[in-house]
Amino acid sequence: MEQKWWHNAVIYQVYPKSFKDSNDDGIGDLKGITSKLDYLEKLGITAIWLSPVYKSPMDDNGYDISDYEDIASIFGTMEDMEELIAEGHKRKIKIIMDLVVNHTSDEHAWFIEARENPDSPKRDFYIWRDEPNGIISAFSGSAWEFDDASGQYYLHNFSKKQPDLNWENEELRHQIYDMMNFWIDKGIGGFRMDVIDMIGKIPDQEIISNGPMLHPYLKEMNQATFGDKDLLTVGETWGATPEIAKQYSNPKNQELSMVFQFEHIGLQYQPGQPKWHYAKELDVPKLKEIFTKWQTELGEEEGWNSLFWNNHDLPRIVSTWGDDGNYRVKSAKALAILLHLMKGTPYIYQGEEIGMTNYPFKSLEDVEDIESINYAHEALEKGVPLEVIMDQIRHIGRDNARTPMQWNDEAEAGFTTGRPWLAVNPNYKEINVEAALADPDSIFYTYQALIALRKEHPWLVTADYELVDAADKVFAYKRVEGEQAYLVVVNLSSQEQDLPLVNGVEEVLIANTKVEQVLESGKLAPWDAFCVKLA
């Protein structure tokens, strides 16, 4: 395998609206991000994945784009963006842009023209039909919206203000590639591609994901834009299997660097149930099975894994699968150690490195997320009690990840001196960056150490993965390269568990516990986690 910079990189996702406000309007912005680059450099990350900062009406927090080559005024200016890229480069931190090309905003110039003039070439940039079929929007209800002006329906797989683009139109595709090259020329480090598996859809057959033209489009995109550049490209692919992931990320196919698979995230939901029916506890044996499949079936010559627990669409991992009460710090460290020592490129979501938690939403008035609000109204109409809906939003709602970054214990957690666009989690007095940096035993320093290990130890990129037999609630695996083996053991529970057999420890690489005591007792205390080099 030809090694690229992203094989031993660690990526940090910034949700700009909630990261750091520099002008006291209560909304995070580009200057705010630039002001915190020294903090991210201290953490040790290689690149920032920046959620969308393009011009947008903000119906879906920037994933509804009205101009791909301009910056939303709430985030700043193009000069601010160029400064962020330049200041990042000074610290060896690349900026990865969020590429949202399944849909635009209905306020994009293309859609405005398509709507106003049915004879315009831009009309075919979108998907219009005389009658709707059965496609359901990801945000509830029909995915078809009637347009009074032209008497046709347009497709929107998300909000009705996010009309889907028609990738069958060659002129549209080349306009998108021109836009990508505009950003590449600005010096960005790559693209995270939003719901990229949907661009090959066949609406008339109700095929939304993984359509037959998906991979030809990606090959064409690769050749027209980033293919000859040293950029990271990662696709969001909810339905991917290892075999599908190989199609995207096998270097021979000349498509993407890697994809985000969500099979492990599916364990947050009850089997066979829609998203809002969350699972009461983690099925650890199933988690072991899923990760082992991806670690062993997506070989390094055939593709590459993305490793993540959190993003802007998911609840906080320490609240979902950790224990955000008695064992918040220890369980956050355990989950980090488990993930970061696997094979692949790890992604950290802002606040994960200090153990930020879900928000205690009390009423629908606290909620900003369009997906949660739409679901709540639909569920109320079906007679679901409000207290059940609020419980679901507290566990699964996307706003859990979007509360402002907690920088210190001052008003509004140091995020803003204004009124924040979304309420700060009330636990910011205890959980914040300033406190984490002052505590040598904080979660932050575990993440910092894991990132340093990845930079120092080539085996983290190249060594094979082997699952180790252990108790149901214990996830243990080896990374093996030639005669050398490294053992990772994590107790994913708040109860004591039996330690799997460990033969001959040469060195402790990282731990959230006293490994010598664990080895002597043969017992793992709640949330014990460590990695050792075996003799």
Q: What are these regions, as identified by a protein language model?
A:
Residues 56-57, 103-105, 198-203, 240-245, ...:
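Flexible loop/turn segments at secondary-structure boundaries
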Residues 5-6, 225, 232, 239, ...:
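Loop/helix patches that line or flank the sugar-binding groove of alpha-linked glycan CAZymes
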Residues 189, 292-313:
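Aromatic-lined glycan-binding groove of carbohydrate-active enzymes
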Residues 519-535:
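C-terminal beta-strand-rich structural cap/linker in extracellular carbohydrate-active enzymes
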Residues 202-203, 304-325:
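Active-site clefts of carbohydrate-active enzymes
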Residues 496-514:
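Beta-strand-rich binding/interaction modules
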Residues 2-177, 181, 185, 196-251, ...:
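Acidic/aromatic-lined carbohydrate-recognition and catalytic surfaces
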